[in-house]
Amino acid sequence: MSFIHLRVASAFSMKYGTTQPGDLVEQAREYAMPALALTDRATLSGAIRFAKACVANGVAPIIGINLPIEITVSDKKTPEQRVTVLAHGDGGWAHLVRLLTGLHINKGEGSTRITLELLEKFSAHSTHLHLLHGPQSPLSYELAAHHPERALDLFNATREFFADHAIECVSHLVAGNGPGSTAHAARSLVFARDHDIDAVITNAVRMRSRSDGPVADLLDCARQLVPLNYRHIERRNAEGYLKSSQEMTLVATEIARAAGEATPRALLKTTREWAERALLSPARDIGLGGIHLPEPHIVGATSQSSMRTLLRSRVEAGIHWRYNANADVKAARIRLDDELATVASLGYESYF
């Protein structure tokens, strides 16, 4: 069974991802993967380019966003906490766009981020989306500190605001017990099993291949405006790349065994199920190939016919403001009738 990556950052994650969306899709096609996710940091800027590349390469798109989250009072030494929100394949794209728009508009003087207050405000959209609690999530840091009770409290704080939740197990084969290690991924898996929460495996991808590691280091330091130095870079090795299905199966096996499970079958099965629920149709869900115009209510109308009436009244008012002579007004009306007929035949009233 082919693996499907659920968390992938492209170069549209400014000063973080190393690879253009199209190149990531081409790599997924070379691996014979049926689908690929794009989950850039706080932006959907690369989503359309990604979806077009998916169509060209015969790969199904999955789209989400990776966002900072503030649901606890963080110590200054604690790294920025983040979660990943995924659109599902039944209207999820529209809700994802509206949620991100709402977060941007209400960010105040800080950066775009999720808070409990904003989740309450935009729950009409967030409750149609899926949430991944990954190694940078508040829950994950509590697990790393061996506080499973606090981790559960944090999970419950966001439970009602999303359609589904999953614990994201990530191992970059880092030494020790912290995020990125197999030990931490296994602890996350055990936590999910203990509390009947779905668990999925991702590779928290930010590179196409291991050779992109030095580029990732430069981006880390440029993002922080600090000199290039080991203490300023995020990665501890070059494992955060777009791995093949075989490579991900090996990682899943290591995590599962460390968690006391004989095989990674359940972990891989749940990951595949989550991917299948998040598959988007480029045409139906995203609207590729279609024409997108403002809805009637945006321009103060209630229907297509009322938009025609509104447009005619506005342009006729413009005629009388611009022309005084009866002959000029008459000629303008004849021209206006022809042009409005063309606009009506195309359904473009709201554009004008």
Language model regions located:
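Non-catalytic structural connector segments
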Residues: 1-6, 192, 257-352
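Extended substrate/RNA-proximal surfaces in nucleic-acid metabolism proteins
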Residues: 1-35, 41-198, 213-223, 266-269, ...
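Flexible glycine/proline-rich, aromatic-decorated loop/lid segments
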Residues: 208-244
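Mobile "lid/hinge" segments at catalytic clefts and subdomain interfaces of large enzymes
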Residues: 244-246, 271
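Eukaryotic intrinsically disordered, low-complexity regulatory linkers and tails enriched in Ser/Thr/Pro
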Residues: 161, 247-249
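Glycine- and acidic
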Residues: 5-11, 32-37, 141, 166-175, ...
